[in-house]
Amino acid sequence: MQTSDTRALPLLCARSVYKQYSGVNVLKGIDFTLHQGEVHALLGGNGAGKSTLMKIIAGITPADSGTLEIGGNNYARLTPVHAHQLGIYLVPQEPLLFPSLSIKENILFGLAKKQLSMQKMKNLLAALGCQFDLHSLAGSLDVADRQMVEILRGVMRDSRILILDEPTASLTPAETERLFSRLQELLATGVGIVFISHKLPEIRQIADRISVMRDGTIALSGKTSELSTDDIIQAITPAVREKSLSASQKLWLELPGNRPQHAVGTPVLTLENLTGEGFRNVSLTLNAGEILGLAGLVGAGRTELAETLYGLRTLRGGRIMLNGKEINKLSTGERLLRGLVYLPEDRQSSGLNLDASLAWNVCALTHNLRGFWAKTAKDNATLERYRRALNIKFNQPEQAARTLSGSNQQKILIAKCLEASPQALIVDEPTRGVDVSARNDIYQLLRSIAAQNVAVLLISSDMEEIELMADRVYVMHQGEITHSALTGRDINVETIMRVAFGDSQRQEASC
Protein backbone atom coordinates (compact mmCIF):
# COMPACT_ATOMS: atom_id res chain seq x y z
CA MET A 1 0.00 0.00 0.00
CA GLN A 2 1.33 3.42 -0.99
CA THR A 3 1.93 6.07 1.63
CA SER A 4 0.57 9.57 1.22
CA ASP A 5 4.10 10.80 0.53
CA THR A 6 4.47 8.28 -2.30
CA ARG A 7 1.13 9.26 -3.80
CA ALA A 8 2.17 12.91 -3.70
CA LEU A 9 5.23 12.24 -5.85
CA PRO A 10 4.78 13.40 -9.46
CA LEU A 11 4.84 10.74 -12.16
CA LEU A 12 7.33 12.85 -14.09
CA CYS A 13 9.50 15.81 -13.24
CA ALA A 14 11.89 17.22 -15.86
CA ARG A 15 14.44 19.62 -14.40
CA SER A 16 16.71 22.09 -16.23
CA VAL A 17 16.60 20.20 -19.53
CA TYR A 18 18.89 21.64 -22.21
CA LYS A 19 19.26 20.54 -25.83
CA GLN A 20 21.26 21.98 -28.71
CA TYR A 21 21.28 21.11 -32.43
CA SER A 22 24.07 22.39 -34.67
CA GLY A 23 24.86 25.19 -32.24
CA VAL A 24 21.21 26.25 -31.94
CA ASN A 25 19.66 26.08 -28.47
CA VAL A 26 16.38 24.18 -28.85
CA LEU A 27 15.64 23.72 -25.13
CA LYS A 28 16.88 26.25 -22.58
CA GLY A 29 16.50 24.86 -19.07
CA ILE A 30 13.00 23.40 -19.27
CA ASP A 31 11.12 22.39 -16.10
CA PHE A 32 8.01 20.26 -16.63
CA THR A 33 5.91 18.20 -14.20
CA LEU A 34 3.13 15.63 -14.63
CA HIS A 35 1.04 14.24 -11.75
CA GLN A 36 -1.09 11.12 -11.39
CA GLY A 37 -4.57 11.41 -12.86
CA GLU A 38 -3.71 14.70 -14.57
CA VAL A 39 -3.85 15.97 -18.12
CA HIS A 40 -1.07 18.50 -18.67
CA ALA A 41 -1.54 20.25 -22.02
CA LEU A 42 1.55 21.44 -23.86
CA LEU A 43 1.18 24.18 -26.46
CA GLY A 44 3.62 26.19 -28.47
CA GLY A 45 4.34 27.74 -31.81
CA ASN A 46 6.30 26.39 -34.72
CA GLY A 47 9.71 25.15 -33.53
CA ALA A 48 9.06 26.01 -29.88
CA GLY A 49 10.68 22.75 -28.75
CA LYS A 50 7.63 20.66 -27.81
CA SER A 51 8.56 17.63 -29.91
CA THR A 52 12.19 17.72 -28.74
CA LEU A 53 11.15 17.74 -25.07
CA MET A 54 8.76 14.83 -25.58
CA LYS A 55 11.39 12.83 -27.49
CA ILE A 56 13.78 13.29 -24.56
CA ILE A 57 11.13 12.07 -22.11
CA ALA A 58 10.34 9.08 -24.37
CA GLY A 59 14.03 8.17 -24.66
CA ILE A 60 14.25 8.84 -28.39
CA THR A 61 16.66 11.77 -28.07
CA PRO A 62 19.18 12.38 -25.24
CA ALA A 63 19.28 15.71 -23.44
CA ASP A 64 22.57 17.61 -23.30
CA SER A 65 22.00 18.22 -19.58
CA GLY A 66 19.26 18.06 -16.99
CA THR A 67 17.46 15.21 -15.22
CA LEU A 68 14.21 13.28 -15.46
CA GLU A 69 12.66 12.17 -12.19
CA ILE A 70 10.27 9.25 -12.74
CA GLY A 71 8.65 7.46 -9.85
CA GLY A 72 11.07 9.06 -7.41
CA ASN A 73 14.21 7.99 -9.32
CA ASN A 74 16.49 10.34 -11.28
CA TYR A 75 17.70 9.59 -14.82
CA ALA A 76 20.14 11.60 -16.93
CA ARG A 77 18.98 9.88 -20.12
CA LEU A 78 16.64 7.12 -21.24
CA THR A 79 16.40 4.72 -24.15
CA PRO A 80 13.04 3.90 -25.78
CA VAL A 81 13.10 0.41 -24.23
CA HIS A 82 13.86 1.80 -20.78
CA ALA A 83 11.14 4.44 -21.19
CA HIS A 84 8.61 1.71 -22.04
CA GLN A 85 9.70 -0.26 -18.98
CA LEU A 86 9.10 2.84 -16.86
CA GLY A 87 5.59 3.15 -18.29
CA ILE A 88 6.21 5.99 -20.76
CA TYR A 89 4.59 5.78 -24.20
CA LEU A 90 4.62 8.41 -26.94
CA VAL A 91 1.75 8.35 -29.43
CA PRO A 92 3.20 10.30 -32.39
CA GLN A 93 1.38 12.87 -34.47
CA GLU A 94 1.97 10.76 -37.58
CA PRO A 95 1.05 7.13 -36.72
CA LEU A 96 4.00 4.75 -37.17
CA LEU A 97 2.38 1.41 -37.97
CA PHE A 98 3.58 -1.55 -40.03
CA PRO A 99 1.30 -1.32 -43.08
CA SER A 100 1.85 -4.94 -44.16
CA LEU A 101 0.95 -6.35 -40.72
CA SER A 102 -2.59 -6.81 -39.41
CA ILE A 103 -4.17 -4.44 -36.93
CA LYS A 104 -3.93 -7.13 -34.26
CA GLU A 105 -0.22 -7.69 -34.97
CA ASN A 106 0.46 -3.95 -34.80
CA ILE A 107 -1.26 -3.58 -31.43
CA LEU A 108 0.50 -6.59 -29.90
CA PHE A 109 3.91 -6.05 -31.53
CA GLY A 110 6.72 -5.89 -28.98
CA LEU A 111 4.52 -6.57 -25.95
CA ALA A 112 5.87 -8.55 -23.02
CA LYS A 113 4.21 -11.94 -22.51
CA LYS A 114 2.43 -10.75 -19.37
CA GLN A 115 0.75 -8.00 -21.43
CA LEU A 116 -0.37 -10.27 -24.29
CA SER A 117 -4.09 -10.54 -23.60
CA MET A 118 -6.61 -10.85 -26.42
CA GLN A 119 -9.45 -10.29 -23.98
CA LYS A 120 -7.89 -7.05 -22.75
CA MET A 121 -7.48 -5.85 -26.34
CA LYS A 122 -11.10 -6.70 -27.17
CA ASN A 123 -12.29 -4.87 -24.06
CA LEU A 124 -10.31 -1.78 -25.05
CA LEU A 125 -11.68 -1.88 -28.59
CA ALA A 126 -15.21 -2.08 -27.22
CA ALA A 127 -14.61 0.77 -24.77
CA LEU A 128 -13.34 3.04 -27.56
CA GLY A 129 -16.13 1.98 -29.90
CA CYS A 130 -13.63 0.82 -32.54
CA GLN A 131 -15.16 -1.39 -35.21
CA PHE A 132 -11.88 -2.80 -36.50
CA ASP A 133 -11.47 -6.09 -38.30
CA LEU A 134 -8.36 -7.13 -36.39
CA HIS A 135 -7.18 -9.25 -39.32
CA SER A 136 -7.22 -6.34 -41.81
CA LEU A 137 -3.91 -4.81 -42.83
CA ALA A 138 -2.97 -1.62 -41.00
CA GLY A 139 -2.10 -0.06 -44.36
CA SER A 140 -5.79 -0.10 -45.27
CA LEU A 141 -6.77 2.21 -42.40
CA ASP A 142 -7.39 5.92 -42.75
CA VAL A 143 -5.46 8.42 -40.64
CA ALA A 144 -8.07 8.58 -37.86
CA ASP A 145 -8.14 4.82 -37.39
CA ARG A 146 -4.34 4.60 -37.46
CA GLN A 147 -4.29 7.15 -34.64
CA MET A 148 -6.66 4.96 -32.62
CA VAL A 149 -4.43 1.93 -33.14
CA GLU A 150 -1.41 3.88 -31.87
CA ILE A 151 -3.29 4.89 -28.72
CA LEU A 152 -4.31 1.26 -28.19
CA ARG A 153 -0.66 0.22 -28.42
CA GLY A 154 0.19 2.56 -25.57
CA VAL A 155 -2.74 1.52 -23.39
CA MET A 156 -1.98 -2.18 -23.93
CA ARG A 157 1.50 -1.55 -22.50
CA ASP A 158 0.01 -0.41 -19.17
CA SER A 159 1.60 3.01 -19.66
CA ARG A 160 1.51 5.32 -16.64
CA ILE A 161 2.75 8.32 -18.61
CA LEU A 162 0.96 8.70 -21.94
CA ILE A 163 2.18 11.39 -24.36
CA LEU A 164 -0.40 12.24 -27.02
CA ASP A 165 0.90 14.40 -29.87
CA GLU A 166 -2.06 16.01 -31.69
CA PRO A 167 -4.29 12.95 -31.03
CA THR A 168 -7.48 14.54 -32.37
CA ALA A 169 -6.04 16.17 -35.48
CA SER A 170 -7.85 13.71 -37.79
CA LEU A 171 -10.75 12.65 -35.57
CA THR A 172 -14.39 13.62 -35.94
CA PRO A 173 -16.17 15.31 -33.02
CA ALA A 174 -17.85 11.99 -32.15
CA GLU A 175 -14.53 10.13 -32.23
CA THR A 176 -12.92 12.87 -30.14
CA GLU A 177 -15.63 12.58 -27.48
CA ARG A 178 -15.20 8.80 -27.46
CA LEU A 179 -11.45 9.18 -27.06
CA PHE A 180 -11.86 11.70 -24.23
CA SER A 181 -14.23 9.31 -22.44
CA ARG A 182 -11.61 6.58 -22.62
CA LEU A 183 -8.91 8.96 -21.42
CA GLN A 184 -11.05 9.85 -18.39
CA GLU A 185 -11.17 6.14 -17.52
CA LEU A 186 -7.38 5.97 -17.75
CA LEU A 187 -7.00 9.08 -15.59
CA ALA A 188 -9.13 7.47 -12.90
CA THR A 189 -6.54 4.67 -12.65
CA GLY A 190 -3.74 7.16 -11.98
CA VAL A 191 -2.37 7.51 -15.51
CA GLY A 192 -0.90 10.93 -16.34
CA ILE A 193 -1.33 12.36 -19.84
CA VAL A 194 0.74 14.95 -21.68
CA PHE A 195 -1.65 16.35 -24.28
CA ILE A 196 -0.08 18.26 -27.18
CA SER A 197 -2.64 20.13 -29.25
CA HIS A 198 -3.44 23.44 -30.89
CA LYS A 199 -7.20 23.16 -30.36
CA LEU A 200 -7.93 25.41 -27.40
CA PRO A 201 -11.58 24.32 -26.90
CA GLU A 202 -10.44 20.69 -26.56
CA ILE A 203 -7.65 21.67 -24.21
CA ARG A 204 -10.07 23.56 -21.97
CA GLN A 205 -12.37 20.54 -22.02
CA ILE A 206 -9.81 17.95 -20.90
CA ALA A 207 -6.67 19.59 -19.45
CA ASP A 208 -6.05 20.31 -15.77
CA ARG A 209 -2.93 22.38 -16.42
CA ILE A 210 -1.45 24.16 -19.42
CA SER A 211 2.16 24.99 -20.26
CA VAL A 212 3.09 27.11 -23.28
CA MET A 213 6.53 26.77 -24.85
CA ARG A 214 8.16 29.54 -26.86
CA ASP A 215 11.70 29.61 -28.23
CA GLY A 216 12.85 26.69 -26.09
CA THR A 217 11.50 27.99 -22.79
CA ILE A 218 8.27 27.73 -20.78
CA ALA A 219 6.61 31.08 -21.49
CA LEU A 220 3.43 30.41 -19.49
CA SER A 221 2.24 27.70 -17.10
CA GLY A 222 -0.71 27.32 -14.76
CA LYS A 223 -4.09 25.77 -14.06
CA THR A 224 -6.41 25.75 -17.06
CA SER A 225 -9.14 27.52 -15.10
CA GLU A 226 -6.79 30.39 -14.26
CA LEU A 227 -5.50 31.12 -17.79
CA SER A 228 -7.49 33.16 -20.30
CA THR A 229 -7.51 32.41 -24.01
CA ASP A 230 -5.86 35.78 -24.67
CA ASP A 231 -3.05 34.92 -22.25
CA ILE A 232 -2.44 31.60 -23.99
CA ILE A 233 -2.47 33.02 -27.52
CA GLN A 234 -0.21 35.90 -26.49
CA ALA A 235 2.26 33.42 -24.99
CA ILE A 236 2.28 31.35 -28.18
CA THR A 237 2.51 34.22 -30.65
CA PRO A 238 3.67 37.39 -28.88
CA ALA A 239 4.40 39.26 -32.09
CA VAL A 240 1.59 41.11 -33.83
CA ARG A 241 0.55 39.11 -36.89
CA GLU A 242 -0.61 40.55 -40.17
CA LYS A 243 -4.07 39.59 -41.41
CA SER A 244 -2.77 39.00 -44.92
CA LEU A 245 0.50 38.31 -46.68
CA SER A 246 2.82 41.29 -46.95
CA ALA A 247 3.45 42.88 -50.34
CA SER A 248 6.92 41.29 -50.35
CA GLN A 249 5.49 37.85 -49.62
CA LYS A 250 2.89 38.22 -52.36
CA LEU A 251 5.65 39.16 -54.81
CA TRP A 252 7.64 36.04 -53.93
CA LEU A 253 4.48 33.94 -54.15
CA GLU A 254 3.60 34.81 -57.74
CA LEU A 255 3.00 31.38 -59.23
CA PRO A 256 5.65 30.20 -61.72
CA GLY A 257 5.39 29.11 -65.32
CA ASN A 258 3.08 30.02 -68.19
CA ARG A 259 -0.06 29.05 -66.33
CA PRO A 260 -3.29 29.76 -68.25
CA GLN A 261 -5.21 32.58 -66.62
CA HIS A 262 -8.93 32.03 -66.06
CA ALA A 263 -11.45 34.73 -65.35
CA VAL A 264 -12.95 34.59 -61.86
CA GLY A 265 -15.90 32.20 -61.80
CA THR A 266 -14.82 30.21 -64.86
CA PRO A 267 -15.40 26.45 -64.30
CA VAL A 268 -12.00 24.76 -64.00
CA LEU A 269 -12.83 21.32 -62.59
CA THR A 270 -16.21 19.68 -63.14
CA LEU A 271 -17.34 16.32 -61.72
CA GLU A 272 -20.27 14.59 -63.38
CA ASN A 273 -21.88 11.72 -61.44
CA LEU A 274 -18.60 10.28 -60.23
CA THR A 275 -18.61 6.84 -58.63
CA GLY A 276 -15.58 5.14 -57.14
CA GLU A 277 -14.24 3.46 -54.03
CA GLY A 278 -16.00 5.06 -51.05
CA PHE A 279 -18.28 7.47 -52.97
CA ARG A 280 -21.05 7.47 -55.58
CA ASN A 281 -22.86 9.87 -57.90
CA VAL A 282 -20.82 12.91 -56.88
CA SER A 283 -21.30 16.04 -58.99
CA LEU A 284 -19.84 19.49 -58.39
CA THR A 285 -18.09 22.37 -60.14
CA LEU A 286 -14.93 24.11 -58.94
CA ASN A 287 -14.46 27.64 -60.28
CA ALA A 288 -11.42 29.84 -60.79
CA GLY A 289 -10.69 32.22 -57.93
CA GLU A 290 -12.76 30.42 -55.29
CA ILE A 291 -12.10 28.21 -52.30
CA LEU A 292 -14.66 25.41 -52.40
CA GLY A 293 -14.96 23.58 -49.08
CA LEU A 294 -15.60 19.84 -49.00
CA ALA A 295 -16.69 18.93 -45.48
CA GLY A 296 -17.79 15.70 -43.87
CA LEU A 297 -16.94 13.19 -41.20
CA VAL A 298 -13.95 10.85 -41.38
CA GLY A 299 -14.98 7.97 -43.65
CA ALA A 300 -17.42 10.07 -45.69
CA GLY A 301 -15.36 9.47 -48.85
CA ARG A 302 -13.68 12.86 -49.27
CA THR A 303 -10.07 11.61 -49.42
CA GLU A 304 -11.09 8.72 -51.69
CA LEU A 305 -12.72 11.24 -54.03
CA ALA A 306 -9.61 13.46 -54.04
CA GLU A 307 -7.30 10.53 -54.78
CA THR A 308 -9.59 9.42 -57.61
CA LEU A 309 -9.55 12.91 -59.13
CA TYR A 310 -5.76 12.82 -59.12
CA GLY A 311 -5.64 9.35 -60.68
CA LEU A 312 -4.45 7.45 -57.61
CA ARG A 313 -7.64 5.36 -57.46
CA THR A 314 -9.76 3.83 -60.20
CA LEU A 315 -12.83 5.71 -61.36
CA ARG A 316 -15.82 3.38 -61.78
CA GLY A 317 -18.24 5.78 -63.42
CA GLY A 318 -18.88 9.39 -64.40
CA ARG A 319 -16.68 12.07 -65.97
CA ILE A 320 -13.93 14.36 -64.71
CA MET A 321 -13.60 17.55 -66.77
CA LEU A 322 -10.55 19.81 -66.42
CA ASN A 323 -10.79 23.05 -68.41
CA GLY A 324 -13.60 21.53 -70.44
CA LYS A 325 -11.70 18.38 -71.42
CA GLU A 326 -12.27 14.89 -70.03
CA ILE A 327 -9.29 13.51 -68.11
CA ASN A 328 -10.71 10.13 -67.01
CA LYS A 329 -8.09 8.10 -68.86
CA LEU A 330 -5.10 10.32 -68.12
CA SER A 331 -2.34 9.19 -65.79
CA THR A 332 -1.46 11.09 -62.62
CA GLY A 333 1.52 12.64 -64.40
CA GLU A 334 -0.62 13.78 -67.31
CA ARG A 335 -3.19 15.31 -64.97
CA LEU A 336 -0.38 17.14 -63.21
CA LEU A 337 0.84 18.56 -66.53
CA ARG A 338 -2.71 19.75 -67.26
CA GLY A 339 -2.71 21.75 -64.01
CA LEU A 340 -4.40 19.43 -61.49
CA VAL A 341 -2.33 19.28 -58.28
CA TYR A 342 -3.07 17.33 -55.09
CA LEU A 343 -1.78 18.01 -51.57
CA PRO A 344 -2.36 14.77 -49.57
CA GLU A 345 -3.47 14.68 -45.93
CA ASP A 346 -0.52 12.57 -44.71
CA ARG A 347 2.55 14.68 -45.44
CA GLN A 348 5.07 12.15 -44.15
CA SER A 349 3.96 8.98 -45.93
CA SER A 350 2.43 10.48 -49.08
CA GLY A 351 3.60 14.06 -49.49
CA LEU A 352 7.33 14.32 -48.83
CA ASN A 353 10.48 12.26 -49.25
CA LEU A 354 11.67 12.70 -45.68
CA ASP A 355 15.26 11.66 -46.40
CA ALA A 356 15.65 13.93 -49.43
CA SER A 357 16.76 17.56 -49.22
CA LEU A 358 14.33 20.43 -48.84
CA ALA A 359 15.30 21.84 -52.24
CA TRP A 360 14.69 18.47 -53.91
CA ASN A 361 11.28 18.11 -52.24
CA VAL A 362 10.06 21.55 -53.31
CA CYS A 363 10.94 20.84 -56.95
CA ALA A 364 9.99 17.14 -56.97
CA LEU A 365 6.90 17.58 -59.18
CA THR A 366 8.76 19.60 -61.81
CA HIS A 367 12.10 17.76 -62.08
CA ASN A 368 10.99 15.78 -65.14
CA LEU A 369 10.17 19.02 -66.94
CA ARG A 370 13.77 20.27 -66.68
CA GLY A 371 15.58 17.40 -68.31
CA PHE A 372 17.35 14.37 -66.87
CA TRP A 373 19.79 16.16 -64.56
CA ALA A 374 18.76 17.99 -61.42
CA LYS A 375 19.82 21.64 -61.30
CA THR A 376 20.91 22.20 -57.71
CA ALA A 377 21.40 25.96 -57.97
CA LYS A 378 17.96 26.44 -59.50
CA ASP A 379 16.34 24.17 -56.90
CA ASN A 380 18.01 26.14 -54.11
CA ALA A 381 16.80 29.43 -55.58
CA THR A 382 13.26 28.05 -55.80
CA LEU A 383 13.39 26.94 -52.16
CA GLU A 384 14.63 30.38 -51.12
CA ARG A 385 11.69 32.03 -52.90
CA TYR A 386 9.21 29.92 -50.95
CA ARG A 387 11.13 30.44 -47.72
CA ARG A 388 10.50 34.17 -48.06
CA ALA A 389 6.90 33.75 -49.16
CA LEU A 390 5.84 31.19 -46.54
CA ASN A 391 8.14 31.95 -43.59
CA ILE A 392 9.69 28.48 -43.70
CA LYS A 393 12.29 27.93 -40.97
CA PHE A 394 15.35 25.86 -41.92
CA ASN A 395 19.15 26.04 -41.77
CA GLN A 396 20.26 24.96 -45.23
CA PRO A 397 18.71 23.69 -48.49
CA GLU A 398 20.53 20.35 -48.22
CA GLN A 399 19.02 19.32 -44.89
CA ALA A 400 16.57 16.41 -44.91
CA ALA A 401 12.85 17.13 -44.71
CA ARG A 402 12.50 14.93 -41.63
CA THR A 403 14.61 17.41 -39.61
CA LEU A 404 11.91 20.10 -39.80
CA SER A 405 9.01 20.60 -37.41
CA GLY A 406 5.59 19.40 -38.56
CA SER A 407 4.47 22.93 -39.43
CA ASN A 408 7.51 23.60 -41.60
CA GLN A 409 7.15 20.21 -43.29
CA GLN A 410 3.61 21.20 -44.22
CA LYS A 411 4.84 24.48 -45.70
CA ILE A 412 7.44 22.58 -47.76
CA LEU A 413 4.66 20.33 -49.07
CA ILE A 414 2.54 23.36 -50.00
CA ALA A 415 5.53 24.92 -51.77
CA LYS A 416 6.01 21.67 -53.71
CA CYS A 417 2.41 21.83 -54.93
CA LEU A 418 2.59 25.51 -55.84
CA GLU A 419 5.78 25.02 -57.84
CA ALA A 420 3.78 22.74 -60.17
CA SER A 421 1.74 25.80 -61.33
CA PRO A 422 -1.73 24.53 -60.40
CA GLN A 423 -4.90 25.57 -62.14
CA ALA A 424 -6.95 23.42 -59.77
CA LEU A 425 -5.41 22.72 -56.35
CA ILE A 426 -6.86 20.01 -54.09
CA VAL A 427 -5.71 20.42 -50.47
CA ASP A 428 -6.60 17.62 -48.04
CA GLU A 429 -6.43 18.62 -44.34
CA PRO A 430 -3.83 21.38 -44.97
CA THR A 431 -3.58 22.45 -41.31
CA ARG A 432 -3.62 19.02 -39.65
CA GLY A 433 -1.14 19.05 -36.78
CA VAL A 434 0.25 22.55 -37.35
CA ASP A 435 0.50 25.28 -34.73
CA VAL A 436 -1.62 28.41 -34.40
CA SER A 437 0.94 30.63 -36.11
CA ALA A 438 1.49 28.31 -39.08
CA ARG A 439 -2.25 27.74 -39.42
CA ASN A 440 -2.69 31.49 -39.87
CA ASP A 441 0.11 31.50 -42.47
CA ILE A 442 -1.57 28.70 -44.42
CA TYR A 443 -4.94 30.46 -44.38
CA GLN A 444 -3.35 33.62 -45.76
CA LEU A 445 -1.55 31.52 -48.35
CA LEU A 446 -4.69 29.77 -49.60
CA ARG A 447 -6.47 33.10 -49.97
CA SER A 448 -3.50 34.50 -51.91
CA ILE A 449 -3.50 31.47 -54.22
CA ALA A 450 -7.23 31.84 -54.90
CA ALA A 451 -6.66 35.55 -55.58
CA GLN A 452 -4.41 34.46 -58.48
CA ASN A 453 -7.51 32.76 -59.96
CA VAL A 454 -6.48 29.25 -58.98
CA ALA A 455 -9.46 27.00 -58.18
CA VAL A 456 -8.94 25.60 -54.66
CA LEU A 457 -10.77 22.55 -53.30
CA LEU A 458 -10.35 22.56 -49.50
CA ILE A 459 -11.00 19.24 -47.75
CA SER A 460 -11.11 19.56 -43.97
CA SER A 461 -12.57 17.83 -40.92
CA ASP A 462 -12.33 21.13 -39.04
CA MET A 463 -15.77 22.66 -39.55
CA GLU A 464 -14.66 26.03 -38.16
CA GLU A 465 -11.87 26.06 -40.73
CA ILE A 466 -14.39 25.40 -43.51
CA GLU A 467 -16.64 28.18 -42.21
CA LEU A 468 -13.70 30.60 -42.07
CA MET A 469 -12.16 29.84 -45.46
CA ALA A 470 -14.74 28.58 -47.96
CA ASP A 471 -16.72 30.63 -50.48
CA ARG A 472 -19.05 27.66 -51.07
CA VAL A 473 -19.34 24.34 -49.24
CA TYR A 474 -20.39 20.85 -50.24
CA VAL A 475 -20.89 18.27 -47.49
CA MET A 476 -20.36 14.55 -48.03
CA HIS A 477 -22.33 11.98 -46.05
CA GLN A 478 -21.68 8.27 -46.48
CA GLY A 479 -20.04 8.79 -49.86
CA GLU A 480 -22.66 11.10 -51.33
CA ILE A 481 -23.36 14.81 -51.72
CA THR A 482 -27.05 15.04 -50.91
CA HIS A 483 -27.46 18.84 -50.76
CA SER A 484 -26.72 21.75 -53.03
CA ALA A 485 -23.72 23.89 -52.14
CA LEU A 486 -23.96 25.95 -48.96
CA THR A 487 -23.36 29.65 -49.52
CA GLY A 488 -23.41 32.89 -47.55
CA ARG A 489 -24.92 32.64 -44.08
CA ASP A 490 -25.63 28.93 -44.53
CA ILE A 491 -21.89 28.33 -44.19
CA ASN A 492 -21.78 27.82 -40.43
CA VAL A 493 -20.58 25.00 -38.21
CA GLU A 494 -24.05 23.95 -37.07
CA THR A 495 -25.48 23.63 -40.57
CA ILE A 496 -22.40 21.80 -41.85
CA MET A 497 -22.55 19.35 -38.93
CA ARG A 498 -26.24 18.69 -39.48
CA VAL A 499 -25.67 17.79 -43.11
CA ALA A 500 -22.53 15.78 -42.27
CA PHE A 501 -24.55 13.63 -39.87
CA GLY A 502 -27.26 13.08 -42.48
CA ASP A 503 -29.88 15.55 -41.25
CA SER A 504 -32.12 16.21 -44.24
CA GLN A 505 -33.39 19.50 -42.80
CA ARG A 506 -30.99 22.41 -43.23
CA GLN A 507 -31.30 24.85 -40.34
CA GLU A 508 -31.84 28.44 -41.32
CA ALA A 509 -29.21 30.93 -40.19
CA SER A 510 -30.43 33.10 -37.32
CA CYS A 511 -30.98 36.81 -37.78
From Swiss-Prot:
Q: Which residues cross the membrane?
A: none
Q: Which PROSITE patterns match?
A: ABC_TRANSPORTER_2
Query: Could you cite one Gene Ontology molecular function of this protein?
Result: ATP binding
| Database matches in SUPFAM superfamilies | P-loop containing nucleoside triphosphate hydrolases
Q: Any idea which positions bind ATP? A: G44, G45, N46, G47, A48, G49, K50, S51
Entry's Gene Ontology cellular component terms: plasma membrane
Top-level enzyme category = translocase
Record's CDD domains?
A: ABC_Carb_Monos_I, ABC_Carb_Monos_II
Q: How does it sit in the membrane?
A: Peripheral membrane protein
Q: What residues does the ABC transporter domain cover?
A: 12-240, 264-503
Q: Which Pfam families match?
A: ABC_tran
Q: What is its main location?
A: membrane
EC number(s) of the enzyme? 7.6.2.13
What keyword terms does UniProt attach to this protein?
Answer: ATP-binding, Cell inner membrane, Cell membrane, Membrane, Nucleotide-binding, Repeat, Translocase, Transport
Q: Which reaction does it catalyse?
A: ATP + H2O + (2R,4S)-2-methyl-2,3,3,4-tetrahydroxytetrahydrofuran-[AI-2-binding protein]Side 1 = ADP + phosphate + (2R,4S)-2-methyl-2,3,3,4-tetrahydroxytetrahydrofuranSide 2 + [AI-2-binding protein]Side 1
Q: Does the keyword Nucleus apply?
A: no
The keyword Repeat is assigned to this record: yes
Q: Which InterPro entries match?
A: AAA+_ATPase, ABC_carbohydrate_import_ATPase, ABC_transporter-like_ATP-bd, P-loop_NTPase
Query: What does the function comment of this entry state?
Result: Part of the ABC transporter complex LsrABCD involved in autoinducer 2 (AI-2) import. Responsible for energy coupling to the transport system.
| Entry-linked PANTHER family | AUTOINDUCER 2 IMPORT ATP-BINDING PROTEIN LSRA, CARBOHYDRATE TRANSPORT ATP-BINDING PROTEIN MG119-RELATED
Q: Which family does it belong to?
A: Belongs to the ABC transporter superfamily. AI-2 autoinducer porter (TC 3.A.1.2.8) family.
**What is the designated name of this protein?**
Autoinducer 2 import ATP-binding protein LsrA
